[in-house]
Amino acid sequence: MRAVVLVGGFGTRLRPLTLHRPKQMLPVLDRPMIEWVAGWLGANGVDEVVLSLGYRPEAFTEAYPDGLCAGVGLRYAVEPEPLDTAGAIRFAARAVGLDQADEPFLVVNGDVITDLAIGALVALHRARGAEATIALTPVEDPSRYGVVPIGPDGRVEAFIEKPDRANAPSNWINAGTYVLNPSVVARIADGRRVSIEREVFPAMVADGTLYALQSDAAWVDAGTPATYLSVQLELAHRTGWRPVGVAVDPSATVEQAVLAEGVSVGAGAVVRGSVVGRRTVIEAGAVVQDSIVGEGAVVGAGSVLDGLSVVGDDVVIEPGRHLHAELVPDPAG
């Protein structure tokens, strides 16, 4: 089976980390996010991934020049202009002939880290004779997502994009993993922006051809600072991951943190509940709490980062400075 992975967005929610690279090339523990996605797809029987590219496509082509990512074959489809989610699917599918194939294909959001069993999704798709089948996952607050109520047979009854929390009919949301028949590509209009969530799926609901599978599998949308941080802390805990090539002073405190290779933590410094990128220096007495620091940065002596502050690559935080819930540099300029 083949899969289209949507990785063309600008990653604005993760700025300043994404000012110079796509979010799917940001590290998650010891490898880029896209390798977690490709590895999961390969483990579920996908033998070829088509990356739908837009923002900084060279980051992917240079990282995987041999066309392999986590053991899965890659093909590239670079959009000349962003045409939203459905437009990206149409472009990628046509670029590699998925719209003319005689079998369904997968579509996956490239910032989702999950262990969903794709075989169950494909089985429901075939059993129901669906045109498209989507995975659903439960969340506490569905207001940031597409909420999807379904009938007893899995047929989707409505597709409600980002409802008010108080008015959401359920907490089962679109998990960003779809099985699509080639006919879906023909539903996507040419020459303009088209959202699969706001336009294509609601039309399929009206036609009765959209189905969904509810799944309690582990699932994280890693596209925000809070979730990008939490997924790494959870994966480190779950897998027993340990940092390598770091220098931590014996008097420093490092708890529930992810330190990338080359990180240095000085005397009396504290790093807790945080992610620190490669070659970053945490100087003596500094505190990094519940925050993210990019690569090659310096957190000055006695400074404090907390409240989910995000510090970009190669930034120098002056000694004694206190950042609370701040972005440095400010993406807004």
Where on the chain are the PLM-derived regions?
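Structural signal for interior beta-strand "rungs" in well-ordered beta-sheet cores
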Residues: 242-333
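Short beta-strand-to-loop element that shapes/binds the nucleotide-sugar donor at the catalytic cleft/hinge
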Residues: 55, 133-150
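Conserved N-terminal catalytic core of the sugar/cofactor nucleotidyltransferase
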Residues: 1-5, 13, 27-113, 118-120, ...
